[in-house]
């Protein structure tokens, strides 16, 4: 048998390595010398890593894929996660729960999270971590009296750093948790110009019931700026945080103390008017080494923030906010895309979106709780979060060029990992099913592997006409804005030398993203097959169009593809103006597909890459090829308004106070010129498929940690080093388990190579395929510390000629970080 590693960028094979093995029946082996060489990698680039096990005839016995991001700047492609208090212990962050947090962080690491903000981990807004205090109870938190152990926070920050990620300290940018005894004089506070956060002329105050919880300063006040800068710098220094995730309560028209009773609007200003100056003041006062961003609730202040030196852009979006699309609120998937587009156009950055699906409503003043919406009924009935409700928002935001912040580590005894459903992060009523975590894992790999296609530099909305039809010729793409349901929402984007077509399935469902009615508002669309996408190639010559038609691929994070990029059938027609039209056959659509159209018609082939052993590896796979790359179905080569409408909706517990130092240097993390991939391989018998395809129950995987690779521009290629981490062993059984039907696990390593320019390689040409169910790669996300896959051969079930041709994984017998507790 052969164990193969393929590194791919888009449709290009960048590099390959393989190891040949001979195993006797019942034997096992560990492969530890597969490598990803640093010269294969370039900075701020996403790759797909495929590891497969093939028999001696080239048939794929097992395979897995993972996204790899090589980056020296996490802000280019932010993948934001949350650490917050445990609902099991009064929303507290405690030392006794560290092990649970560690498991969640390992799983999030495997999902390529490169930045975390620690939510409500502070003592008070004006004194986040009192010096010399090992543990404190949040006095302002009257509903749960949360306790925070500073040792627990510090250890979790350290773990985040060890994973190569950054840790942000959450805090409000202008709040004081002591309304009756604020830290600064009353002259520094912001005063309501209208009745809003209290009465006109009174200090702007957030109240829960009759209890004032926070009072707010004017962010433009220089005394406040100096005070909070000193407080935050001290807290971040002591606890090891890398930056500040600033929060706002929403926009409001305010005055200073002197003009608090004025009725002249000229004496007032919007709080958002001072966001940019506040951020810039923090950069000057705290220092450029600390990252900072603020939550512009519901967006809309892009012009004001355009000159702000914030490192990433973060918007918490609500359905009560006005859409970028005129005359609407931001209630539909298309409204999310419109906001992401606006931020990209104004700032050039990829928007981090906080958008909470379902948001169960439960009135706990009633004994046992009373549901106030459908999602609340689901929670009281013990139902889990709808997977597709989450995935459709993930898909929409990623396809638009943003990142949906949704995954949280909460040390929740009822969930191995949490998906945010409400604005107060420790309170997530709906459990998260194991299969939902698996699908989320696959989406995170996809978003990482194809980050340059989704939100790379120069990627913009395309002006080329695009449409989708079903097999009967009915147009399914009815609304390009994405605000109408029961359609295949189809839009095109373009980048340097390529185009993509994003397909979001809303057939049979509405376009609302919030889904507060839960299962009563089903978010699982009707799966589609045999679709035809037509993309205008207006302006291309016939010769250019013909070449482009031979460079069309389809991929998806869903189970039928799990990130594999497949050559698509494509032909050419002409429109009424005689312009070429690309006609693409799409075999299947579950939730989200991406078509990749390579438009560079002038590139010339380069020498094939050379593997570690010095053997030539052909990186062009023909449709007749029988190599492991061709055989593997998973292979790729690679305004705020006058009244405070832009405020957060009220929540059961207030979302009061939320918040990366550069990742460890290359010198600290690396010590060799290539990424070793350790794999333990063995074999288990199953019925061999005559058609060489591998069904769901036939598929095995090679498991390892997620691959997020910070890179250093300063280090030379010769000195570049990489360390590889992989997690606990994957065990194997010859007896099928109920989880074998989802058999695509994660391939991931932690690697740190230097920036290296990479020459283009040949395009992958896979067999033009109509994808079958046997290619479905539903799998359990596996996180491993030692990338080992044990494959055992059963002598009584395997003939001498086939003993090296089969593999089977039993995930229920797998000891995997973050999965055992599912």
From Swiss-Prot:
- Matches recorded under InterPro entries: Glyco_hydro_66, Glyco_hydro_b, Glycoside_hydrolase_SF, Ig-like_fold
Record field: compositional bias (Polar residues):
693-705, 771-788
Q: Where is the signal peptide?
A: 1-38
Q: Which CDD domains match?
A: GH66
Q: Does the keyword Protein transport apply?
A: no
> Domain of life of the organism in this record?
Bacteria
Which region ranges are annotated with the description Disordered?
607-669, 683-788
- Look up keyword Transport and say if it applies: no
Q: Name one Pfam family in it.
A: Glyco_hydro_66
Compositional bias, Low complexity, is annotated for 619-636, 706-761
Write the Enzyme Commission number(s) for this entry: 3.2.1.11
GO molecular-function term, one example from the UniProt record:
dextranase activity
Top-rank EC class of the record's enzyme: hydrolase
Which Gene3D superfamilies does this UniProt record tie to the protein? Glycosidases (3.20.20.80), Golgi alpha-mannosidase II (2.60.40.1180), Immunoglobulins (2.60.40.10)
Give the catalytic activity. Endohydrolysis of (1->6)-alpha-D-glucosidic linkages in dextran
Similarity comment: family membership? Belongs to the glycosyl hydrolase 66 family.
- Name of the protein in question: Dextranase
């Amino acid at each position: 048998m052969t164990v193969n590693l393929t590194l791919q960028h888009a449709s290009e094979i960048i590099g390959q390595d393989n190891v040949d093995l001979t195993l006797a029946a019942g034997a096992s082996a560990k492969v530890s010398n597969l490598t990803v060489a640093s010269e294969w990698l370039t900075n701020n680039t996403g790759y797909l890593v495929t590891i497969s096990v093939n028999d001696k005839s080239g048939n794929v016995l097992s395979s897995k894929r993972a996204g790899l991001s090589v980056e020296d700047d996490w802000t280019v492609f932010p993948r934001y996660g949350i650490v917050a208090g445990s609902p099991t212990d009064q929303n507290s962050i405690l030392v006794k729960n560290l092990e649970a947090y560690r498991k969640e962080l390992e799983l999030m690491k495997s999902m390529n999270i490169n930045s975390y903000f620690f939510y409500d981990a502070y003592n008070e807004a004006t004194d986040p971590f009192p010096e010399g205090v090992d543990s404190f109870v949040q006095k302002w938190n009257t509903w749960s009296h949360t306790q925070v152990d500073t040792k627990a926070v510090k250890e979790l920050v350290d773990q985040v750093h060890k994973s190569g990620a950054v840790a942000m300290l959450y805090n409000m940018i202008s709040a004081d948790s002591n309304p009756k005894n604020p830290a600064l004089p009353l002259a520094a506070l912001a005063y309501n110009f209208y009745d809003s956060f209290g009465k006109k002329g009174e200090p702007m105050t957030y109240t829960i019931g009759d209890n004032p919880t926070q009072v707010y300063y004017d962010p433009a006040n220089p005394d406040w700026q100096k005070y909070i800068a000193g407080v935050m710098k001290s807290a971040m220094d002591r606890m090891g945080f890398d930056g500040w995730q600033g929060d706002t309560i929403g926009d409001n028209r305010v005055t200073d103390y002197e003009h608090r009773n004025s009725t002249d609007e000229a004496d007032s200003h919007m709080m958002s008017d001072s966001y940019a100056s506040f951020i810039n003041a923090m950069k000057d006062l705290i220092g450029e080494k600390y990252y900072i961003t603020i939550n512009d609730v519901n967006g809309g202040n892009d012009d004001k923030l355009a000159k702000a030196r914030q490192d990433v852009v973060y918007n918490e979006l609500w359905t009560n906010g006005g859409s970028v699309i005129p005359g609407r609120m931001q209630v539909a998937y298309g409204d999310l895309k419109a906001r992401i587009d606006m931020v990209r156009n104004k700032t050039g950055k990829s928007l981090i979106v906080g958008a909470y699906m379902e948001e169960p409503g439960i009135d706990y003043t009633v004994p046992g709780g009373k549901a106030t919406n459908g999602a609340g009924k689901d929670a009281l009935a013990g139902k889990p979060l709808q997977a597709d409700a989450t995935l459709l928002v993930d898909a929409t935001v990623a396809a638009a060029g943003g990142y949906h912040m949704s995954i949280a580590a909460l040390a929740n005894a009822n969930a191995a990992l949490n998906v945010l459903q409400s604005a107060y992060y420790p309170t997530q009523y709906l459990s998260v099913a194991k299969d939902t975590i698996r699908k989320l894992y696959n989406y995170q790999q996809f978003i990482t592997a194809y980050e340059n296609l989704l939100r790379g530099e120069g990627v913009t909305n395309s002006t080329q006409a695009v449409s989708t039809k079903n097999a009967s010729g009915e147009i399914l793409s009815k609304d390009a804005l994405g605000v109408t349901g029961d359609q295949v929402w189809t839009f095109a984007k373009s980048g340097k030398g390529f185009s993509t077509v994003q397909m979001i399935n809303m057939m049979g469902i509405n376009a609302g993203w919030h889904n507060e009615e839960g299962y009563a508002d089903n978010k699982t669309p009707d799966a589609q097959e045999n679709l035809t996408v037509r993309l205008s190639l207006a302006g291309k010559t016939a010769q250019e169009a013909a070449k482009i038609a031979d460079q069309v691929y389809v991929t998806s994070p869903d189970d039928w593809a799990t990130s594999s990029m497949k050559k698509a059938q494509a032909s050419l027609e002409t429109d009424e103006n005689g312009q070429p039209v690309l006609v693409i056959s799409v075999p299947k659509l579950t939730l989200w597909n991406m078509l990749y159209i390579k438009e560079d018609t002038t590139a010339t082939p380069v020498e094939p890459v050379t593997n570690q052993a010095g053997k030539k590896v052909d990186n062009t796979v023909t449709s007749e090829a029988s190599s492991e790359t061709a055989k593997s179905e998973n292979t790729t080569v690679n305004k705020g308004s006058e009244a405070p409408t832009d405020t957060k909706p009220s929540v059961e517990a207030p979302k009061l106070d939320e918040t990366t130092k550069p990742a460890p240097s290359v010198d600290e993390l690396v010590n060799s010129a290539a990424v070793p991939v350790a794999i333990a391989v063995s074999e288990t018998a199953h019925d061999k498929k005559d058609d060489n395809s591998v069904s769901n129950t036939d598929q095995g995987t090679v498991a390892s940690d997620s691959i997020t690779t910070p890179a250093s521009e300063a280090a030379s290629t010769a000195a570049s080093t990489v360390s590889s981490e992989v997690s606990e062993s994957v065990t194997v059984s010859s007896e099928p388990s109920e989880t074998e039907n989802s058999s695509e696990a994660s391939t991931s390593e932690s690697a740190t190579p230097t920036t290296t320019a990479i020459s283009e390689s040949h395009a992958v040409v896979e067999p033009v395929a109509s994808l079958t169910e046997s290619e479905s790669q539903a799998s359990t996300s596996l996180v491993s510390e030692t990338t080992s896959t044990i494959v055992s051969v059963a002598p009584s079930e395997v003939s001498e000629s086939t003993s090296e041709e089969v593999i089977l994984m039993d995930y229920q017998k797998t000891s995997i970080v973050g999965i055992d507790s599912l």
